[in-house]
Regions:
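Outer-membrane beta-barrel biogenesis signature
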Residues: 23-62, 132-154, 165, 336
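Surface-exposed strand-loop-strand hairpins of Gram-negative outer-membrane beta-barrel proteins
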Residues: 29-35, 53, 64-85, 171-180
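Hydrophobic, lipid-facing positions within transmembrane beta-strands of outer-membrane proteins
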Residues: 42-45, 55-57, 61, 83-87, ...
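Residue-level signature of outer-membrane beta-barrel architecture
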Residues: 50-52, 63, 91, 103, ...
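Outer-membrane beta-barrel channels and translocator barrels
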Residues: 54, 94-98, 106, 131-135, ...
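Membrane-embedded beta-strand positions of outer-membrane beta-barrel proteins
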Residues: 59-63, 101, 126, 153-157, ...
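Outer membrane beta-barrel transmembrane domains
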Residues: 64-74, 132, 222-336
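Outer-membrane pore/translocation modules
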Residues: 107-222, 336
Length: 336
């Protein structure tokens, strides 16, 4: 497609549209995103494939509050809430190659066990961006507004490094269960693909799919492996206000999450699936994102509207049984 070249400042504002989200099981997820007054919109949980410009530095902080539904059968050990905070730094190494570092900090509260607070496992994510314009090709250094309406894609990979604590204990000096620890104890790997298409001047469609694999970890009290995760997300971002220095978007999303049951060592040391874990969940969410110059702020809420858990009556505090997931995100782009 042809059209006038995208101004440098606008290209920079579009930098943060890339949003490969490390879907950290039981530990929240981080999504980065910005946009300019013109061009494609960014979703809230769904990855966008638009990369960072070469030499651009991206900074983001996200805080996600997750209160859980309380059940009489889980008393006195109901999990009450989790707070997932994430600091993100990204850099554009090439017009088509971006990398991000994620540093999580988690708070997990449970009746009768107190609150466990600590850093999670940091992650490194690399994304390769390409587009379709009379054939597939890497994203060029400059794109016009017309060219930004082409199909855009990215392939991304994530590695988490086991640096978060895994041996925290309750005030009664009992070990927290693996899903109440703030770290995983072993590396995890995620691969994903994202796509975006600007449908008109104000409406952008986005989608992504990813798979995450967790290696087992030996704790002082057990050997445990978190279940594999498959995520498929889709979103519409609608630009409702656009001025030279300000933009306001509304976004609606549907998120699919499939969790393979966690596994724990039996008496003989073999890892066996845990019946009270895993399942399939559908989330729906709405949010608003505002942009002012190089800064962006977003507020979003989502909740599960359908769930098929493997043993729901014993899965209090798991995905799908949240009251809601409410996230606040602040981000900033520094030019080269």
């Amino acid at each position: 497609m042809s059209g006038r070249a995208l101004p440098g400042a606008l290209a920079l504002c579009l930098a943060g549209l890339l949003a490969p989200a490390p879907a950290l099981a039981h530990h929240g997820s981080a999504v980065v995103g910005m946009a300019g007054p013109e061009g494609p919109g960014a979703a809230l949980e769904t990855t966008s494939p638009i990369p960072l410009p070469r030499g651009a530095l991206f900074l983001m902080v996200k805080s996600e509050w997750v209160p859980y539904r309380q059940f009489d059968w889980a008393d006195p050990e109901n999990k009450t809430y989790s707070l997932f905070d994430t600091l993100v730094a990204g850099y554009g190494f090439a017009p088509w190659l971006s990398a991000y570092v994620f540093l999580p900090y988690n708070v997990k509260a449970q009746d009768g066990a107190g609150t466990n607070v600590g850093f999670g496992d940091p992650g490194v994510l690399v994304s390769l961006a390409f587009k379709y314009d009379e054939g597939f090709r890497l994203v060029p250094a400059k794109e016009s507004l017309d060219e930004l309406q082409d199909w855009h894609f990215s392939v991304f990979g994530l590695l988490t490094v086991p640096m978060g604590p895994t041996i925290a204990a309750t005030p009664a000096l009992e070990w927290y269960a693996p899903d109440m620890q703030t770290g995983f104890g072993s590396p995890s790997f995620q691969l994903g693909l994202s796509a975006a298409k600007q449908l008109d001047d104000d409406l952008t469609w986005l989608a992504d799919a990813s798979f995450q694999y967790f290696l087992p970890h030996t704790y002082p009290f057990t050997r445990y492996q978190f279940g594999f995760e498959t995520r498929v997300n889709t979103a519409l971002a609608w630009r409702v206000v656009a001025t030279p220095g300000f933009r306001l978007d509304l976004a609606g999303e549907v998120n699919f999450l499939n969790l393979v049951p966690d596994r724990e060592a039996d008496g003989g040391g073999s890892l066996q699936p845990l019946p009270a874990s895993g399942g399939t969940i559908l989330y729906g969410g709405l949010g608003v994102r505002a942009y002012a110059g190089r800064f962006s702020a977003a507020l979003a809420a989502r909740t599960s509207f359908a769930r098929w858990l493997n043993d729901q009556a014993a899965q209090q505090g798991s995905e799908g049984l949240e009251v809601a997931r409410v996230a606040l995100t602040l981000s900033w782009v520094l030019p080269q």
